[in-house]
């Protein structure tokens, strides 16, 4: 996770939790002059559109005061959904035995895109079973990780 994203998580975690939600994670996507700040919120009851709207208003107020992003950006708030993104070691731990897709910065076993079963997590190292091979991947090397939904 980049330094700005860490700072944003620290800044926004308490306001989101005050509304009764968990800040599942966030993505800051720079797209030229206009960027996107995407927050994922969750709770045990599920997330409804009203929850997203209320969280958006609260987060906007905090962002206006703190002003951590100097360029224009669009704020998006949503639930993680069934193909939820995974950001932390704790989140990968929740999905041991499940299938995930990860994109890595530095190739692992010759690939930047991997799909496999979460075997375990130790510290900041994720173990995936990919095509029968166990691969160990540093969480810092994961650009993006998502749960693959079962239907």
Swiss-Prot record:
<dbReference type="GO" id="GO:0006412">
    <property type="term" value="P:translation"/>
</dbReference>
<keyword id="KW-0690">Ribosome biogenesis</keyword>
<dbReference type="InterPro" id="IPR036847">
    <property type="entry name" value="RimP_C_sf"/>
</dbReference>
<comment type="function">
    <text>Required for maturation of 30S ribosomal subunits.</text>
</comment>
<protein>
    <recommendedName>
        <fullName>Ribosome maturation factor RimP</fullName>
    </recommendedName>
</protein>
<dbReference type="Pfam" id="PF17384">
    <property type="entry name" value="DUF150_C"/>
</dbReference>
<dbReference type="InterPro" id="IPR028989">
    <property type="entry name" value="RimP_N"/>
</dbReference>
<dbReference type="GO" id="GO:0005829">
    <property type="term" value="C:cytosol"/>
</dbReference>
<dbReference type="InterPro" id="IPR028998">
    <property type="entry name" value="RimP_C"/>
</dbReference>
<dbReference type="InterPro" id="IPR035956">
    <property type="entry name" value="RimP_N_sf"/>
</dbReference>
<dbReference type="InterPro" id="IPR003728">
    <property type="entry name" value="Ribosome_maturation_RimP"/>
</dbReference>
<dbReference type="Pfam" id="PF02576">
    <property type="entry name" value="RimP_N"/>
</dbReference>
<dbReference type="GO" id="GO:0000028">
    <property type="term" value="P:ribosomal small subunit assembly"/>
</dbReference>
<comment type="similarity">
    <text>Belongs to the RimP family.</text>
</comment>
<keyword id="KW-0963">Cytoplasm</keyword>
């Amino acid at each position: 996770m980049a330094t700005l994203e860490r700072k944003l998580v620290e800044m926004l975690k308490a306001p989101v939790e005050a509304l009764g939600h968990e800040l599942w994670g966030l993505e800051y996507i720079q797209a030229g002059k206009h960027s996107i700040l995407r927050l994922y919120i969750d709770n045990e009851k599920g997330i409804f559109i009203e929850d997203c709207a209320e969280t958006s208003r609260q987060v906007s107020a905090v962002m206006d005061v703190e002003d951590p992003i100097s360029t224009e950006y669009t704020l998006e708030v949503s639930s993680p959904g069934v193909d939820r993104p995974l950001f932390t070691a704790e989140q990968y731990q929740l999905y041991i035995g499940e299938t995930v897709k990860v994109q890595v910065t530095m190739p692992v076993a010759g690939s930047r895109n991997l799909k496999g079963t979460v075997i375990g997590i130790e510290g900041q190292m994720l173990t995936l079973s990919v095509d029968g091979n166990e691969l160990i991947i540093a969480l810092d090397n994961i650009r993006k990780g998502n749960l693959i939904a079962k239907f």
